[in-house]
Amino acid sequence: MVLISATRDFRERTKSKLVKIMIWAGIVVITFAIAVRIYPIFIFLLKERIKPLVEALYDKLPWIWEVSLSRYWDRLIDFLDRYLWACAQRIQTGIRKQKGEFVVTFSCRVKKRLYARAIEVGIHLSLLSNLFWILKTTLAVGYRLLWVLYYIISFEGFLGSFRLYLVYFGFYCLLFSGKWLRTSEDRGERQAQISGILLRGMLIECAFSVLCLEEDSNLHAL
């Protein structure tokens, strides 16, 4: 009995530590994804805002005149631009079907089985993000005075990225669930539910995209 109790306590402590590690790993990855998606803003700040400040400081430090500041600065910016662009191209996430199972696909194609509860969390988060998108589009279509707000929210596809981050978070919730899809019947039922919900979300998004484009074309015609 003592051995069983000690083993159970060890499992609980290990599980709690693992959950903390996974939470921090998810926070780091999501933060990196957000930074990569908005990296053009950082490049702009480096070129237009930070570089003049560094050059002004450089003029006051004659002991480093031997170093060509502008050349190395431009090289640094070019390197960051190319590196972050490559990262943005490699960050891909989605769900694809392989050998009867749903697989989360990242840039390195790490395969993780989907848990039942985590699938539900991811679906609900995806639908919640679609509600944000619908609210934004409804405001833009229904009220002409809010077009400025619409364009601000739509800057660089920010809201689309927000939906992506919610799906990211849903996928990381896979690590916190303890229920496997053990049987093919459960797996097939979950696949059908996922397909139906995602299809409805796609149809809703397409419908509102058409409304938004029609409203935009009407404004340009006026």
Curated annotation (Swiss-Prot):
<dbReference type="GO" id="GO:0009507">
    <property type="term" value="C:chloroplast"/>
</dbReference>
<keyword id="KW-0150">Chloroplast</keyword>
<protein>
    <recommendedName>
        <fullName>Uncharacterized protein ycf73</fullName>
    </recommendedName>
</protein>
<dbReference type="GO" id="GO:0009536">
    <property type="term" value="C:plastid"/>
</dbReference>
<comment type="similarity">
    <text>Belongs to the ycf73 family.</text>
</comment>
<keyword id="KW-0934">Plastid</keyword>
